[in-house]
Amino acid sequence: MSQARIIKAAAAQISPVLNEAEGTLHKVLDTIDQAARQGVQIIVFPETFVPYYPYFSFIRPPMASGAEHMALYEHAVVVPGPITDAVAQRARQHGMVVVLGVNERDHGTIYNTQLIFDENGALLLKRRKITPTFHERMVWGQGDGSGLKVVDTRVGRVGALACWEHYNPLARYALMTEHEEIHCAQFPGSLVGPIFAEQMEVTIRHHALESGCFVVNATGWL
């Protein structure tokens, strides 16, 4: 899209329902409904919001986190599946673009996955975080570059990256070459204090400036 237009976007900076995928899903659907009442056309949720970001990996050693790993695996999202079907239906109902981060379960592995649903409820993009960050490698498998794409929606050309992928110049460049107009940045909540927020703001401002696109940044709330 090259014509001038006004888009109303929302960053859903909310907390999940820990250890309860259905509870977090209902929170997602309720938030979409609330955003629709306010005229929102695109909404972005935080990194791996469904069922929840693995905060346990920040504070417990892997060998002591077996139960937490199994709980996350059991609640992880199958794509496509009942959870994605429910989100797609709500996106279609409101004519809204929905960008959702999930823990995706596939063939025995959990992935950090970003989903983009268009205004018709179609799943336009499923991409996996290419290289999980530091402690995350004990939780998620590696993705690949096949998801570094920008998709056409009613609000324009939309792309997404997760957290520390914004420090990967080639990942950002891949989206720039596809003429990204709206960038969806997803981050978890932080246990390390204000330095995380400061770094986050620098990197998303940098991407907006360098790419010439708008950035919607959604960060989890602890």
Model-identified regions with their sequence ranges:
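Residue-level recognition of short loop/turn positions
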Residues: 120-121, 155
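N-terminal glycine-/serine-/threonine-rich phosphate-binding loop
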Residues: 1-42
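CN hydrolase (nitrilase-like) catalytic-core segments centered on the catalytic cysteine
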Residues: 76-99, 157, 163-222
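Short hydrophobic alpha-helix segments
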Residues: 120, 126-127
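A short, polar/charged loop-to-alpha-helix boundary motif
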Residues: 128-143
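Metal-dependent catalytic neighborhoods of phosphoester/phosphodiester hydrolases
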Residues: 49-69, 110
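Active-site-proximal beta-strand elements of phosphoester/diester hydrolases
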Residues: 6-18, 113, 126, 150, ...
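Short beta-strand scaffold segments in enzyme catalytic cores
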Residues: 100-102, 113-116, 149
